[in-house]
């Protein structure tokens, strides 16, 4: 390939890379808006799934009255919001409507450029498979989202926590898949990253991903509203009743005390793992990009844990809860960057 041929190809990769990062950024915003929707108890305000016509909010007083009437028919209204006015309903409606509107924006921002890049032959080899995975996840997410919402429309006053966790994890997986693909289109320095570092980076990303799911279970079970002390729970390191349901794995999903206990101790494991990775990388190559990524990961993990503690002891103020969720996604994204970049650096050295 001549230099003149290489330049357009490189420019094309840069365009695809920028697009992938941009969509990942939109998903980041989407997750934060989703968190605000949950924290404001707004997620059940729209009781119908209308993928096309739902883009337009109620425009007349009659439309608003009809929408409010539908909300008044579900259990959440009588249990939590029996004194809600139409103006109050509009507030929670717009949170959920904004969340769904952003989902549609993300769909368009992904699908339309993807079709153009595909027709231009930009999705070759592993990148094509990565885009296919991201497409599947994006298509699945709204289906799971409605499945989650529907769980709170009949017998419950909130959505099922396991469906909430799945909804968040699919969003996080899509976010991670886009970042993984985007980092793979960049150039990496020639640094000696051992197979052990690659495996450790992948394991860390998986651990943080699991921690995101545990955080969603804490949110769905309202477990942040109990045991608002730190570092002990109920005055003990291991509180009574942990894993007390039968069979015991049910406690992970259905018991608030167990959910908070799990989330706390996996947080400690994440901090310890990031610190160990940062120290090992610095000892191996102090000035390497691996060492810098390790330092960023450790700093984010410590910040995230501190935000979690503050959120807990202050009994979940919305601003700290949203910051906690935002940094969690940043930490996961950085872990994916580190995993992909470390693997690429190892291949670069091996290929020399």
Task: Spell out what each predicted region is.
Residues 1-352:
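Polytopic transmembrane helical bundles with strong interfacial aromatic enrichment
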